[in-house]
Amino acid sequence: ERHVGRKSTNNLNLTCQWGTCNTTTVKRDHITSHIRVHVPLKPHKCD
């Protein structure tokens, strides 16, 4: 998860640093879900 990091040590904002994205969230699970925009992971095979 090297593309996810805190903007600074004085706040709780998590920033996506994938390319030029820079999407910011306050919860780790939100940024983890956001990363799926960049990684086309399909957990289930379509029929």
Swiss-Prot record:
InterPro entries: pacC/RIM101, Znf_C2H2_sf, Znf_C2H2_type. Keywords: Activator, DNA-binding, Metal-binding, Nucleus, Repeat, Repressor, Transcription, Transcription regulation, Zinc, Zinc-finger. Its main location: nucleus. It comes from the Eukaryota. One of its GO terms (cellular component) is nucleus. A zinc finger (C2H2-type) spans 14-38. It is found in: Nucleus. SUPFAM superfamilies: beta-beta-alpha zinc fingers. Transcription factor that mediates regulation of both acid- and alkaline-expressed genes in response to ambient pH. At alkaline ambient pH, activates transcription of alkaline-expressed genes (including pacC itself) and represses transcription of acid-expressed genes. Belongs to the pacC/RIM101 family. This is pH-response transcription factor pacC/RIM101.
